[in-house]
Structures are given as C-alpha cells and as structure tokens.
C-alpha cells in the first residue's frame, strides 16, 4: 500500500464528539495510514539498526468514556508491545502530527537510559536539530522546543526521567496540519526517514 500524508480530515477526527463516533472516525480515516506507516518503517528501522522491529497501532481498547485526543503507531523490538522499551512513534493530535523517539513511564530501563543520555549531554544539545521538540508527558501535546533549552535545562529533564517514577521523555518533530497541504507522499516519507536518522543515536545510547 502506498504511504499517504495526513490530511485535514485526519486532524478533524479529534473534533468528533463521543467515544464511539470518534473511534469509528479514527478507524476509518487514520488507522489505515498508520498501518501503512507501520509496515514501511518497521522494515526501515530493522534495516537501520540490524534488529527486528515490530509496529503497534494504538487501539485505545481501555477507553470506556472519554474519546482519545491523539493516536499513533509505535515501533519497538518486542512483538508483544512497546511501552516497556525505548521506542519510536508516528502519530497525530488535532493540532499537529509527531515523529518521536522516547521512553515512557512503563519502561523499566529508563533510569539506566537516563544516565547514559547524561553522559552525552553536550552532544545531545549540539547535535539534535534546532526544530526538534521535547515532551515530558506523552498524554499531553505540550512540548519544549530544543532551541530554547540550555544544557542545564536538558540535564534537568533527563535527570527527572531517572528519579521520578512516572517521568517520561520523548524527542522529535511536530508537523503542523497546514504543512501537509503542500507535502507529497514522497516528501512525507523522506521527512520521517530524516527524523529517524537524527533520533537513532539516542536509541543507540539508550540500548548500549
């Protein structure tokens, strides 16, 4: 299946009221694209890392009342899940799409990974592109732009990952809905590949 960019109708899904109606809209408009992204980039990540990667499309199965405000496909080296490992995500909120590498609170190795990242603090500050953003909570759309952080700020959020049980850390890019109006499918694929290329050093640090 051909990889397709996200369109305005995909972002509008998150304005649909009600759990059942919004989930039906997600399944109709977004999940087929996430499946295609999953197929494409699980192979890409396997090729880039030499490890088998598997993709996991968010099903939101535990939701009983409140509809999801975002959705995604995640990539990890575990066929059964991704939350317990450093992983990659591609997804969207109503306000933006995102491409991330991260560790969320269910990951038991996040303390060890945080200490490894701290050893490379100056490299992270220098080498991560200025248009990247950091998230400390995957359930919220708020982020910290990399170009606004000093090394001490970066150190603080990485140390928090190690010391706070519920702490998380994700890094990557946001793409505004209007950017997709002039983005071809091929350009979207290239954007994802270049973002993953910039994030792979962090993956390698966290898995050494």
Swiss-Prot record:
Gene3D superfamilies: Protein of unknown function DUF1054 (3.30.930.20). Pfam families: DUF1054 (PF06335). HAMAP family: UPF0637. Belongs to the UPF0637 family. This is UPF0637 protein Bcer98_2662.
């Amino acid at each position: 299946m051909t990889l397709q960019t996200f369109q305005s109708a995909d972002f509008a899904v998150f304005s649909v009221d009600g759990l059942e109606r919004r989930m039906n809209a997600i399944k109709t408009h977004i999940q087929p694209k996430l499946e295609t992204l999953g197929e494409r980039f699980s192979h890409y990540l396997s090729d880039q890392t030499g490890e088998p990667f598997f993709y996991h499309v968010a099903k939101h199965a535990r939701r009983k009342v409140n509809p999801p405000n975002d959705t995604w496909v995640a990539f990890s080296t575990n066929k059964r899940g991704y939350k317990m490992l450093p992983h990659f995500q591609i997804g969207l909120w109503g306000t933006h799409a995102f491409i991330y590498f991260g560790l969320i609170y269910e990951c038991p190795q996040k303390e060890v990974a945080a200490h490894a990242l701290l050893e490379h603090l100056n490299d992270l500050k220098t080498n991560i592109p200025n248009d990247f953003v950091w998230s400390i909570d995957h359930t919220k759309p708020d982020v910290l732009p990399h170009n606004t952080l000093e090394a001490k700020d970066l150190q603080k959020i990485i140390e928090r990952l190690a010391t706070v049980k519920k702490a998380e850390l994700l890094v990557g890019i946001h793409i505004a809905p209007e950017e997709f109006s002039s983005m071809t499918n091929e350009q979207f694929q290239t954007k994802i590949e270049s973002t993953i290329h910039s994030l792979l050093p962090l993956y390698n640090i966290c898995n050494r």
